[in-house]
């Protein structure tokens, strides 16, 4: 079986107050296109936790203190050839120093 990866799914957690800015930014770069539809994303409310160490400059919270943040997990598909451009824009607008980003390769149904 020869599988040609043409799309990826980008998943990132974002503070709830910033999710629309991130969504608009990645979709304006070309993420979230499915057939004849654009801005196709999914978001799920969640609680993120982290402890910034002494070297961190946290957007939310204090160094060396456990933080609980209302976040949304934002998901969007993206053509693999524009993924780097989308990720660059995501990092530019995301408020965190080190956002948690997953990049999942997608298999086309016809390749199964």
Model-derived segments and spans:
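Hydrophobic structural segments
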Residues: 1-112
């Amino acid at each position: 079986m020869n599988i040609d990866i043409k799309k990826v799914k980008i998943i990132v957690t974002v503070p709830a107050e910033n999710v629309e800015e991130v969504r608009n930014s990645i979709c304006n770069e070309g993420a979230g296109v499915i057939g004849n539809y654009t801005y196709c994303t999914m978001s799920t409310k969640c609680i993120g936790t982290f402890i910034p160490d002494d070297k961190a400059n946290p957007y939310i919270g204090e160094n060396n203190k456990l933080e609980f943040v209302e976040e949304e997990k934002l998901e969007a598909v993206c053509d693999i050839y524009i993924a780097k451009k989308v990720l660059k824009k995501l990092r530019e607008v995301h408020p965190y120093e080190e956002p948690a980003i997953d990049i999942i390769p997608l298999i086309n149904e016809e390749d199964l």
